[in-house]
Design a protein with these regions (language model features):
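Nucleotidyltransferase catalytic core that binds NTPs
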Residues: 2-161
């Protein structure tokens, strides 16, 4: 039985691509990530979700300031940067996307985070939990490229280095 109208709107053939990050503050490395996200998505929808964490040491920008900064630094991706006060982590994102009717999802992250997110996102697929519920037909975690924290330039850039 179908309980919600959104269940009629299943996007079975489309894969929604997304990324999730602190981007606090945004860097050239984040710009590379957004470019790779858009390229991997092609004609499929893609979305950028930012964490809401804030503290004086590692996360100086508020959520709203971070949204403004990322949109200003990367204007060609501005429309894909989502504002969602309900999204606190990657599982919240998947629950949201599942609720929007998507059944295939691909997360694009730095190479150092692929295994972590593959394990985490698949662990909760099909399970009701604090984040809500999602049951995707396919969950992929794709590397945006190598990230070497010791490297110079784009490959080594992170907000923590600033």
């Amino acid at each position: 039985m179908i309980n919600k109208f959104s269940q009629f709107l299943v996007e079975e053939e489309k894969v929604v691509y997304f990324t999730f990050g602190r981007m606090n503050p945004p860097t050239i490395g984040h710009g590379k990530l957004l470019d790779v996200l858009a390229a991997k998505a092609g004609r499929n929808p893609h979305k950028v979700f930012l964490s809401q964490s804030q503290d004086s040491k590692k996360n100086p920008l508020s959520y709203s300031d971070k949204i403004k900064s990322v949109r200003k630094m990367f204007p060609k991706h501005a429309r894909n940067i989502m504002i969602s006060k309900n999204v606190k982590n990657a599982m919240d994102i998947l629950s949201t996307l599942y609720g929007q009717g998507f059944r295939k999802v691909a997360m694009v992250v730095g190479s150092d985070r692929v295994i972590e997110f593959e394990t985490l996102l698949n662990k909760y697929n099909g399970k009701e939990a604090r984040h809500g519920f999602y049951n995707f037909m396919d969950i992929k975690v794709i590397s945006a490229g190598e990230r070497d924290p010791d490297a110079e330039g784009v490959e080594g850039m992170s907000a923590s280095k600033q």
